[in-house]
Amino acid sequence: SMRTELKSTRRKEMMGLRRVKTAAALERNTWFHLSVNSCEEMLYSLRRVNDACQEHIDNNFVPLDAERRKEFAPLRDKLNSVFNQVKTIIEYGDYASLPAAHRACIEADKAFSICRHAEMSRIQTGMGNITTEYVYLNMIQESQQLVISLRHLLRAADHFATGLSSSNSSILLSSTE
């Protein structure tokens, strides 16, 4: 499972930290744990989305209407794109692409925020199936949380890989948390 793989990777990275000079290990230890926490937060968000959707399906669900599907599709695509950008940066150590990925995270966060506010307004009007609307709102909120966790992961990975003197750090630290 993904959780088992994450634990295995974490163990290997901890063993690697033991082989590094103490000063470097201490400096990077915090960033290492923050990146692990970000990954755990993402898994938890995905589980929360899955649980809500699964429960909705198990209870003779009313499907999401075409308007909501059309609204969410570009957000989903944007989230997938950001995930792929972050994956590439971390996988290949391409930290020069970090500012662009950070901007993409901020744009995605704003887009999810706009969508969340619109959905909350629709819920308040009482139109539509309230259960479906709440499941949709949950999807939006958890997707937005995924973007926030990705931003935190980027920051932690940058610090872990390049140290605190990185020129990219000022970009990441200046963002709203």
Predicted regions span which residues?
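Cytosolic, long alpha-helical scaffolding segments
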Residues: S1-E177
